[in-house]
């Protein structure tokens, strides 16, 4: 271990997602191991380690396990931006899901006389998107038991903290070109999904909402949730909406609002840390 101080791990894919957290960090110390950068310090009254994991499921999972191996971690948090799926959510809002699934761990079905069919013997349980049939992943938990699992739960105490915070926290509307008409809100509970894809497609977004009732989607959180669950560590992901995936000028919205979304997520993340 790099140090023996009990810490909360806070992961973000990009520097912009961790910017507000790094600004608020005190007693900061940098640690580099084989190219991996970890920043320890105090944040919202808690000892933490900030980790920029990089975009993608593999990067996120690798960074999460690496952090658990190198530090004495009590809780795992992901903070940053995401694409909106639920049409009721707006850019700048923060979504704290109750569970995360890996919607692009899939079977590519064969086309038959009546349409695409999944492989025999591989359970799906969810409707398909063309040839794509989502399936559970095989996981081994901290008790050593192996099972098929689609949803990875968020720690109840961390959800409770988020719900209490949602009543009082005031999120930013931004400023200048990145200013919103209405003050964003925090939504707690429900589903969210992650996969190795930047989604700029309305049909896929609609499918994800109808099939999984997901509030948001991203490229990292479910992978970190998977690692946290296997290690028996409490987990939460806090995601600010930078765009509505595939809607209108979604890619332009992302460019304009990803920092605001990340900063709003950071505000909620720090509130949750204070409550732990």
Regions found by a protein language model. Name each.
Residues 2-6, 32-276:
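Glycine-rich phosphate- or other oxyanion-binding loops that anchor nucleotides, phosphorylated ligands
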Residues 24-28:
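Short Gly/aromatic-enriched secondary-structure transition segments
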Residues 7-16:
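Gly/serine-rich nucleotide phosphate-binding loop at the start of the catalytic core
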């Amino acid at each position: 271990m790099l140090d023996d101080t009990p810490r909360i791990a806070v992961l973000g894919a990009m520097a912009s997602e961790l910017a507000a957290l790094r600004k608020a960090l005190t007693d900061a110390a940098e640690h580099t191991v084989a190219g991996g950068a970890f920043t320890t310090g105090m944040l919202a009254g808690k000892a933490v380690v900030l980790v920029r994991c990089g975009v993608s499921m593999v990067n996120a999972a690798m960074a999460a396990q690496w952090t658990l191996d190198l530090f004495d971690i009590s809780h795992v948090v992901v903070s940053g931006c995401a694409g909106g799926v639920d049409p009721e959510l707006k850019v700048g809002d923060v979504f704290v899901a109750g569970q995360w699934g890996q919607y692009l761990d899939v079977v590519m079905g064969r086309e038959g006389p009546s349409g695409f069919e999944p492989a025999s013997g591989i359970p799906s349980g969810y409707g398909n998107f063309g040839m794509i049939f989502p399936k559970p992943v095989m996981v081994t938990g901290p008790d050593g038991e192996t099972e098929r699992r689609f949803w990875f739960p968020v720690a109840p105490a961390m959800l409770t903290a988020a719900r209490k915070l949602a009543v009082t926290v005031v999120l930013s509307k931004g400023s200048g070109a990145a200013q919103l008409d209405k003050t964003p809100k925090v939504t707690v509970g429900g589903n969210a999904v992650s996969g190795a894809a930047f989604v700029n497609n309305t049909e896929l977004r609609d499918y994800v909402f109808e099939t999984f009732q997901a509030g948001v989607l991203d490229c990292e959180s479910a992978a970190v949730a998977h690692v946290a669950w296997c290690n028996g560590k409490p987990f939460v992901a806090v995601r600010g909406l930078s765009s509505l995936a595939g809607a209108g000028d979604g890619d332009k919205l992302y460019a304009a609002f990803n920092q605001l979304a990340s900063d709003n997520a950071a505000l909620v993340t720090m509130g949750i840390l204070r409550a732990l």
